[in-house]
């Protein structure tokens, strides 16, 4: 009896059903090395191989978006999914639902491979690093909007210099979408003209968790930024590709705030030193001119003949006029400098906050009260406003929980 001839689609459909109904093939974990990696609009296509065999794989976007690291050729991974037949060309392949690195070594391999590539391209060269401004007016912080990182940065910034504006740009800092959000934030900030420096920050974590900061797209966005970027990712011992590309690496997010935000007390000391130096220079210049003038008067007295006396008299008159004009010019110039410095110093005065609607609370000894621990019920206090002052009695003291 002659066997019935089956059409190609029939035998292919039969094989597909056998595989789809196989209890083992419906849920398998396969270990191997990635090769022929291709990213497509529909998903990720690659081949999984070992020393003897190879297996075609596909991970569609619904699962690919859950990856928390970037796949690369040569990376050792473990793929979980199902084996089935792709009917169009009659080949079987692994439909991946999740991919994990085969140990931390795979991620280190990808890290070192990208590091070597970018280093050869010159992205780490020190002569291409942009200087961090010493007196920034506005700082952008690209990080998660919740957690200790942004709280620490804001607290330290306000303590060091409350006049510096902090712009928080919220992004994901781990997961498959984090790299794209970070790049988008950097592009948006580079379209603004009011940002002086960018802090890119997140707290510590495993290599997988901080992996977005090791992705090539993030590295290239940092390198392309016209605004200086400070990388502050993880703990002091953590290093990422972002650290190498950034214009400056801070060991922690808190350290980044200490580095970038100038201390207002340093401003005040600088202004005081400039004022002292200005007064010293003015005094020295006036004394020098006075000595020169006294010397000419003495020469006139010692050379008494009429002609010499007349010549010296004219010389003294000219010098006197010149001295007066020069002293007047110096005085006006130094006075203008002093007024500018005084205005800067006044702008930094703690009393300046009164003009912005804040108040200052003093005790009986005229000392500033900065904590509820400094007062108790029925204490007499004084409240300073921008346009006057008031006395009050404390009714109740309650500390924050």
Curated annotation (Swiss-Prot):
Its EC number is 3.1.11.6. Keywords: Cytoplasm, Exonuclease, Hydrolase, Nuclease. It comes from the Bacteria. One of its GO terms (biological process) is DNA catabolic process. The keyword Cytoplasm applies. It catalyses: Exonucleolytic cleavage in either 5'- to 3'- or 3'- to 5'-direction to yield nucleoside 5'-phosphates. GO terms for cellular component: cytoplasm; exodeoxyribonuclease VII complex. GO terms for molecular function: exodeoxyribonuclease VII activity; nucleic acid binding. It is found in: Cytoplasm. Bidirectionally degrades single-stranded DNA into large acid-insoluble oligonucleotides, which are then degraded further into small acid-soluble oligonucleotides. Heterooligomer composed of large and small subunits. Belongs to the XseA family. NCBIfam families: xseA (TIGR00237). This is Exodeoxyribonuclease 7 large subunit. It comes from Thermoanaerobacter pseudethanolicus (strain ATCC 33223 / 39E). The gene is xseA.
């Amino acid at each position: 009896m002659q066997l019935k001839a089956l059409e190609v689609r029939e035998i292919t459909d039969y094989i597909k059903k056998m595989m789809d109904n196989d209890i083992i093939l419906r849920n398998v974990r396969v270990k191997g090395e990635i090769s022929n990696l291709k990213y497509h609009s529909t998903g990720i296509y690659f081949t999984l191989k070992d020393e003897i065999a190879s297996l075609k794989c596909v991970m569609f976007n619904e699962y690919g978006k859950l990856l928390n690291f970037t796949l690369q050729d040569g990376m050792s991974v473990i793929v979980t999914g199902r084996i089935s037949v792709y009917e169009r060309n009659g080949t079987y392949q692994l439909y991946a639902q999740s991919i994990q690195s085969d140990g931390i070594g795979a991620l280190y391999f990808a890290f070192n491979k990208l590091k070597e590539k970018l280093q050869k391209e010159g992205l780490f060269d020190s002569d291409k690093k942009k200087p961090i401004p010493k007196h920034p007016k506005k700082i952008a912080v690209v990080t998660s909007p919740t957690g200790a990182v942004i709280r620490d940065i804001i607290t330290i910034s306000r303590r060091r210099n409350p006049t510096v504006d902090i712009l928080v740009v919220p992004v994901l800092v781990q997961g498959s979408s984090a790299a794209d959000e970070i790049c988008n934030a950097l592009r948006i900030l580079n379209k603004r003209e009011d940002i002086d420096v960018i802090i890119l920050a997140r707290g510590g974590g495993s290599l997988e968790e901080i992996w977005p900061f090791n992705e090539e797209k993030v590295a290239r966005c940092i390198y392309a930024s016209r605004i200086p970027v400070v990388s502050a990712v993880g703990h002091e011992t953590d290093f990422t590709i972002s650290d190498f590309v950034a214009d400056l690496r801070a060991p922690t997010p808190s350290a980044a705030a200490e580095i970038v935000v100038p201390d207002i007390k340093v401003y005040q000391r600088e202004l005081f030193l400039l004022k002292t130096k200005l007064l010293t220079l003015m005094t020295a210049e006036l004394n020098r001119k006075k000595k020169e003038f006294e010397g000419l008067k003495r020469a006139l007295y010692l050379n008494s003949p009429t002609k010499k006396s007349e010549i010296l008299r004219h010389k003294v008159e000219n010098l006197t006029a010149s001295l007066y004009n020069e002293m007047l010019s110096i005085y006006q110039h130094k006075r203008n400098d002093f007024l500018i410095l005084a205005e800067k110093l006044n702008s930094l005065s703690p009393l300046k906050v009164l003009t912005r609607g804040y108040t200052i609370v003093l005790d009986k000894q005229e000392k500033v009260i900065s904590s509820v621990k400094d007062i108790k019920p029925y204490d007499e206090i004084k409240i300073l406003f921008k346009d006057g002052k008031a006395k009050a009695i404390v009714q109740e003291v309650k500390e924050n929980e």
